[in-house]
């Protein structure tokens, strides 16, 4: 399958193309998001063309892609320190097995070293896209951005051209800022009272 449209869209969105062959594309990007508690999302995108997407492919690819992401975007920072790594796997398949569809449409547990695996599939025979459309609590500030990326890759001319603001991230930023201001006010009050 020709993946030129996906390559162009990844490039337009600021991703660096790491590799490309007849079966897929690998791209990376690191970006800071003030609307996501001022955190940095490091994203590795794998776009693959397969004949039939089934659980054996997803299981093998998940392990391989998470390991590749650690090599492509290494970090010396502790796991909890204002950084996240997302692995987005977008499959273009002639057919999608029902178990693979269910896997793509369900929330994924965090991978090793807090890498989030976000699979999606486009069934070329029906034109249907399958990906999880919910938002989990952990890493939730990024899900609107990941869904946007998947929509743009499965239909590069569909939907908005710019990443959406993370409403969940804005709410969390306001909550954290309010708590920080309360802590500062309490510290000043106690310091003045002696």
Predicted segments — roles?
Residues 1-52:
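N-terminal, charge-rich interaction modules
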Residues 183-194:
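Juxtamembrane boundary at the C-terminal end of a transmembrane helix
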Residues 46-53, 92-96, 122-126:
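Short, flexible beta-strand-to-coil junctions
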Residues 43-76:
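A broadly used, surface-exposed interaction patch
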Residues 156-180:
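Juxtamembrane cytosolic/matrix-side boundary and N-terminal portion
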Residues 21, 106-159:
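Charged, structured surface patches that assemble and position nucleic-acid processing machinery
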Residues 55-56, 97-102, 130-131:
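Switch/connector loops and helix/strand junctions flanking conserved nucleotide-binding motifs
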Residues 77-106:
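Nucleic-acid nuclease catalytic cores
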